């Protein structure tokens, strides 16, 4: 009989995008409970040790975190298994570096460095709007923030820009055709394109059609769409590759061209 929450995570069962190899151990760090789901997050230990290579072991990561060097969304985090997720800003004051967790076209979190100016805000997708006690309107975002008294124009699936210092909404983008979006789940994870149309299926999943900058079209569920800009202008900087997924043949040609130019 299971008693209470699970405390372990086997390496083989860890999300593939963490890119842990099978043979270096039995266990993987199990993310703490937090604003992002286990399968959609990147624990700080993996970001600092496996991605940035700032530490060799988990103990070293703990020593870095306990010196209060690491901030996520402007708050100091000392838990090495804290689940950082999509659009989170990780700041390391000691080195003056800022990173935003964003997917690459292969669906993995990429080490995406950003400027100090861009590190002051983040984008959040509105999950739902509800009326709380005493008729106070609330808005719940994808990273579990609850914001009271939002602009009455903001609806579910829109994107809000949040100032990390105050936690207040500064601007918002409507979920609308012609806006730039990123896919945050499913087979097209990490692709970026412009919303062309939305198919409504009452009682089932709404389907959104997206067209990327090379003219390729694809469709995904509404729940996987995260609006990141108005028109073609993104509100956050986009990692290398610009969210365009190449076919295997195109990737091969690109590799060969790079090889020839270097030789």
Swiss-Prot record:
UniProt KW keywords: Ribonucleoprotein, Ribosomal protein, RNA-binding, rRNA-binding
Taxon lineage: Eukaryota, Metazoa, Chordata, Craniata, Vertebrata
HAMAP family: Ribosomal_eS4 (MF_00485)
Location of the S4 RNA-binding domain: 42-104
One Gene Ontology cellular component annotation held by this UniProt entry: cytosolic small ribosomal subunit
A single BP term in Gene Ontology: translation
GO molecular function: rRNA binding; structural constituent of ribosome
Listed Pfam families: 40S_S4_C, KOW, Ribosomal_S4e, RS4NT, S4
Name assigned to this protein: Small ribosomal subunit protein eS4
Gene3D superfamilies with a match to the protein in the record: 2.30.30.30, 2.40.50.740, RNA-binding S4 domain
Originating organism: Ictalurus punctatus (Channel catfish)
Family under the similarity heading: Belongs to the eukaryotic ribosomal protein eS4 family.
Taxonomy, superkingdom: Eukaryota
